[in-house]
Amino acid sequence: MEKKAKESLRRYKKAARHSATHSSSSDSTSDSDSGSSSYSSTDSEQGVGGVGVGVGVPGGAGGPGGSGSVHGHPHTHGHGHHPRSAERHHRKKKSSRRGGSSSGDEPSSSRRKRDKRDHVQKKLVAKRNHIKRKLKEARLKKRAAAALSGHVHRSLSPTTRAKLKKLAERKRLRAASKEQRERDKLRVVQRDRERDHHRLGSSRSPPSSSTTTTTKIRIHQDIVGKRQKSPGLGSGLGGGSSSSSSRMHHQLMSREKIIIQTRARGRTPSLERERERERERERERERERHDLSLRERDRRDRERERAEREAARDKERAEALARCQERQRERERLAREKLRRQEEEEGGKRGGPGRDLDLPPYGSRERSLDTVERERERERSGRHVRDKRELDPYEREQEYLEERHGHGLIDEMRRYRRRDLSPMPEHYAPRLRDPRELYSEEERERAYKRAYLDARYSSREREAWLEARELRERELQGREYRDLETEDTLYPDERERLIRDRERDRERERDRERERNIGPRGDFRPEWEREWEEEGAGGGPGGPSGTPGRPGGFVGGPKRGKPPAHAGGGPPSQQQHHSASEPDWDADERERERERERDRERERDREDRPDTGGGGAGGDRPSIKNEPAWLEHDQREKPRGWQQQSSNSGGDWRDNDDAPPAPSHPHPASPHHHVHPRGERGSGRGFRRGGHGHGDHGERPGYRSHPPPLMTLPVQPPGGYSRGFPHKRLPYGSGRDGAALGARDGGLPGSSTFLKKHTHAPLVSPTQTPLLNPLLNAAKPNAAAQASAVAAATTAVAAAKAAAQSAANATTNPGILAQVSKLNTVCIKQEDASEDSAGTPELGAQDSPTQSLNLNQSLSSEGNPVKQELIRTSAVEGELSEISDSDDDILNKTDKVRPKNELPTETEQEMDTNADEVKSEALHIVAGHPIKGEEGDEVLDFEEISDGELEEDARHKGIGDALGVDWQGLIAETRQQASDAQAAQQGVDRGTSAKQRWQPYRVLLDLGISFGMAGEGYARCVMEEARQQLLQEKEQGQQRELDGDEEPPAKIPSPLLDYREFLASQQQLEPLACVQMGLRSAAVERQRLVGNVCGPGSRALSARQDLRLRRQLCGLPARECEFPRSVPIVGEGLRNLAMQMFQRRLLDVK
């Protein structure tokens, strides 16, 4: 044995170099170097290594004599060399320790000895590894040979196998428990780390030293020939001791792979490390507390600085406000001095009321107003000493308020001042009850911040609206709220009319100023103001007027907030060069001069016109309520030169009894060219679009050129078409417009309770004027007769207007005409369909004969049946005689202007004679059945209307034609009838609820049922049952209607044939659901075609409709199907073959 061991050692020397490098790599995967699995200690390794020389090889040779000792049977045979080798090993260790301690000073001989011992030790270790490898190879060869020879059972005895199995099981359980402990330890460490992480709140990753890595070691080892650390290793040599029998027997690995998890360097943190970590956490918390305190201190510092800045800013604001107030007081003082010097220069001569209206327009202090009054009294009485009562006028506030209610002059002065320099309307309170509420401190400060704003425009609109509300409240005191009509509110078109009256007076003053060559503030005017007159010459009254509308060529005109551009040498805008709170003294001088001229003009008017029936602008009409004095100073609609009338009319053509003259703008080159000034199309800021009729602008009343036929171009009705005020969109206005006309022209005191409310713009349409003007001419010699005739005519027109919506088609459909004549006592409510102008006739769509027809229907229904035919025939003959047979003449026709001196026709004379009896009835009709408006008694929005909205409205306009036919109304009626008939034909009658429509029997009748899917008998039974249920439901509905349990649904013409009955009848029931549906759709189409031919409201039978009917009745397709000629015609035989195949397929499906 020793020889073989020596041989193996010699073999090892040859491969020493290789084993020195290879053993650490290849054998590390085995159990030799793992240290924790194979061998328990260095002593055992050394001992086994020493013994292995003499023991291991016989097992490798596989001799029969060494079978018992090789495989580790627990025979306690002594081992002779083992104690000596152990002793030698301990000595070696002691000498190596001793040599390690005194390595510096020991002699070289001992160092050589130590080196030699180390070299021998290394050789022994290498030899041990080599022998292990050789043993493994031998085992593998032996196992392979045994497997080939089939004698495996000879290698191990049953008891050996049982013991090995038990040891392997114990080893496996030990490894499993160790792995479980490792896992538990890892889980505990991870939990501690997470707890620390959450407690610190830091996002730092845990230190890498505490991480645990799991190393997987794969060990392929076999049990056969495995050494055990037991005393039985040297049993083959005989003899031995049982001293090491108490050692733990380490069973090496089994055949299968076992994964051992070890901790790579990361151990459980020690106590010192835990303390260090805790100290680190404490330092972190301290730093966080310090940062929080720093942040809090910074925040407090910032808040203190902000408060100091706010206090400094408030102080600066207060100082600036005090400075501004001081400057204002200085200005007021200078203004009073200037007024006093001017009056001294005039020799004490007092001016007209214009002097008070031209006070410095600063409305924040009423004390200045009161002081000026007292200065005038002081100058009149000659005293020049101020007392304390004079210096503090707020003691006289109650007296001032009483005087304001009683004294019209102070009232007008306050209105003028509040209008001129009030802030923007959105900063207003809804009502101004006290003079001190005019300017709050906040608004005064805002005025200094917004010096660039021109405050006149929006404040003027606001003031007009406030005055209108005051007028309404004074008029309607003591009346029931429900008695008020919806038109009682003063809308922007009324304001526009009032403001235009005022503007005409201003324009006259400016013209007189220009005649005297009084050039205010230099002759320079900006280019847009100088050229505006010429550019706007052909554009109607949108040009030089004060509305911010565009003239003809001035496309980029201002929309909002732009000061008015003045004509001629008039003054530029009053507040272009100073802030909203500073007055313009030159403008006030000019205003004073104009007021004096205005007073002289009024005096001349009173002398020239002793009769005040017309109620001129300067006449004695008692309408300071209706047209307050501040309206004379608005700079809005400046009229053209052709609107300046002679002085006997007071400068307003509407006060005359004559029709206005023709406009100065030239006729357009084409009759399709529309002459629509910008102001009429809807200029103005916040005003209703086109709130003034053509007559207001002096346009020739009969002249209205039409657009090309059936085009949807915008045609503005004279009553205006405004989205902002939809309930004002009646055709040509209704009773209120006529009443307003009468109130303006007649000014009757007797009818003032009814007519005073309607201060709307006189919506004079081109169709109205030929009807009403001869009435005025006929009654002109006698003022009383004129007033009664005008009132009667206007109220009659108001009553007749209510029927104008459905009577617009009177000339085309006599049946509708007969129906309309019955509508004398009920005013037609304007439904929501008027949003699409369905019932709103356009300008060209309702000519004067149609209006006279409507009027005469309302007259004749109240007791003039004999005259009705005469009136109707004469009107229709006159209408037809004006139209020639030429299409061009029809399309290019314009309304004829009736000359002023033309005698009234017999129609109007009859109207005149019947005017008195009609008047009260018409008043009763209009008052008893007010026209339904939409919600809202007061409109508080002053939102301007943009061009985009105008174009959008234009797209919604109806279709107007030269023949006066309301095509839009006809189309709407036809659509309604068609939808009703279609709903009835489809069985969806208006009394049917959604729940009823989704009943199973209705669904089955609508969809059909397939015989192939359900079976023929069952399908017929189901359809018949559904049909019976439908009939039963109809009978129940009729019974409920008879009993009066529910309100009867809208009457719809019953279909000629119920398609459900047709579908479910036993003879017509087809086997396929698609065929049933096809039959139903064919029946519905046929019924629709036939039902539209006759019946109420049906159209005349056209050629197209006739052809469709014939195609339907003959079974032809609805449209002509044109096949290309290249398609071959299918032969009869081929067609029959295809049909047979189709029927066979159907039979197969069944």
UniProtKB/Swiss-Prot annotation:
<dbReference type="GO" id="GO:0005634">
    <property type="term" value="C:nucleus"/>
</dbReference>
<feature type="compositionally biased region" description="Basic and acidic residues">
    <location>
        <begin position="270"/>
        <end position="414"/>
    </location>
</feature>
<dbReference type="GO" id="GO:0008380">
    <property type="term" value="P:RNA splicing"/>
</dbReference>
<feature type="region of interest" description="Disordered">
    <location>
        <begin position="1034"/>
        <end position="1053"/>
    </location>
</feature>
<dbReference type="GO" id="GO:0016556">
    <property type="term" value="P:mRNA modification"/>
</dbReference>
<comment type="similarity">
    <text>Belongs to the ZC3H13 family.</text>
</comment>
<feature type="region of interest" description="Disordered">
    <location>
        <begin position="833"/>
        <end position="914"/>
    </location>
</feature>
<comment type="function">
    <text>Associated component of the WMM complex, a complex that mediates N6-methyladenosine (m6A) methylation of mRNAs, a modification that plays a role in the efficiency of mRNA splicing and is required for sex determination. In the WMM complex, acts as a key regulator of m6A methylation by bridging fl(2)d to the RNA-binding component nito. Required for sex determination and dosage compensation via Sxl alternative splicing: m6A methylation acts as a key regulator of Sxl pre-mRNA and promotes female-specific alternative splicing of Sxl, which determines female physiognomy.</text>
</comment>
<feature type="compositionally biased region" description="Low complexity">
    <location>
        <begin position="21"/>
        <end position="44"/>
    </location>
</feature>
<dbReference type="GO" id="GO:0000381">
    <property type="term" value="P:regulation of alternative mRNA splicing, via spliceosome"/>
</dbReference>
<feature type="region of interest" description="Disordered">
    <location>
        <begin position="1"/>
        <end position="444"/>
    </location>
</feature>
<comment type="subunit">
    <text>Component of the WMM complex, a N6-methyltransferase complex composed of a catalytic subcomplex, named MAC, and of an associated subcomplex, named MACOM. The MAC subcomplex is composed of Ime4/Mettl3 and Mettl14. The MACOM subcomplex is composed of fl(2)d, Flacc/Xio, Hakai, vir, and, in some cases of nito.</text>
</comment>
<dbReference type="InterPro" id="IPR040427">
    <property type="entry name" value="Flacc"/>
</dbReference>
<feature type="compositionally biased region" description="Low complexity">
    <location>
        <begin position="851"/>
        <end position="861"/>
    </location>
</feature>
<feature type="compositionally biased region" description="Basic residues">
    <location>
        <begin position="162"/>
        <end position="175"/>
    </location>
</feature>
<feature type="compositionally biased region" description="Low complexity">
    <location>
        <begin position="98"/>
        <end position="107"/>
    </location>
</feature>
<feature type="compositionally biased region" description="Gly residues">
    <location>
        <begin position="47"/>
        <end position="69"/>
    </location>
</feature>
<dbReference type="GO" id="GO:0007530">
    <property type="term" value="P:sex determination"/>
</dbReference>
<keyword id="KW-0175">Coiled coil</keyword>
<feature type="compositionally biased region" description="Basic residues">
    <location>
        <begin position="72"/>
        <end position="97"/>
    </location>
</feature>
<keyword id="KW-0507">mRNA processing</keyword>
<keyword id="KW-0221">Differentiation</keyword>
<feature type="compositionally biased region" description="Basic residues">
    <location>
        <begin position="11"/>
        <end position="20"/>
    </location>
</feature>
<feature type="compositionally biased region" description="Pro residues">
    <location>
        <begin position="660"/>
        <end position="669"/>
    </location>
</feature>
<feature type="compositionally biased region" description="Basic and acidic residues">
    <location>
        <begin position="693"/>
        <end position="702"/>
    </location>
</feature>
<protein>
    <recommendedName>
        <fullName>Fl(2)d-associated complex component</fullName>
    </recommendedName>
</protein>
<feature type="coiled-coil region">
    <location>
        <begin position="122"/>
        <end position="147"/>
    </location>
</feature>
<dbReference type="GO" id="GO:0036396">
    <property type="term" value="C:RNA N6-methyladenosine methyltransferase complex"/>
</dbReference>
<feature type="region of interest" description="Disordered">
    <location>
        <begin position="477"/>
        <end position="710"/>
    </location>
</feature>
<feature type="compositionally biased region" description="Basic and acidic residues">
    <location>
        <begin position="492"/>
        <end position="529"/>
    </location>
</feature>
<feature type="compositionally biased region" description="Basic and acidic residues">
    <location>
        <begin position="428"/>
        <end position="444"/>
    </location>
</feature>
<feature type="compositionally biased region" description="Basic and acidic residues">
    <location>
        <begin position="589"/>
        <end position="611"/>
    </location>
</feature>
<feature type="compositionally biased region" description="Acidic residues">
    <location>
        <begin position="879"/>
        <end position="889"/>
    </location>
</feature>
<feature type="compositionally biased region" description="Basic and acidic residues">
    <location>
        <begin position="890"/>
        <end position="903"/>
    </location>
</feature>
<feature type="compositionally biased region" description="Low complexity">
    <location>
        <begin position="202"/>
        <end position="215"/>
    </location>
</feature>
<keyword id="KW-0539">Nucleus</keyword>
<keyword id="KW-0508">mRNA splicing</keyword>
<feature type="compositionally biased region" description="Basic residues">
    <location>
        <begin position="110"/>
        <end position="144"/>
    </location>
</feature>
<dbReference type="GO" id="GO:0007548">
    <property type="term" value="P:sex differentiation"/>
</dbReference>
<feature type="compositionally biased region" description="Basic and acidic residues">
    <location>
        <begin position="1"/>
        <end position="10"/>
    </location>
</feature>
<feature type="compositionally biased region" description="Basic and acidic residues">
    <location>
        <begin position="176"/>
        <end position="199"/>
    </location>
</feature>
<keyword id="KW-0217">Developmental protein</keyword>
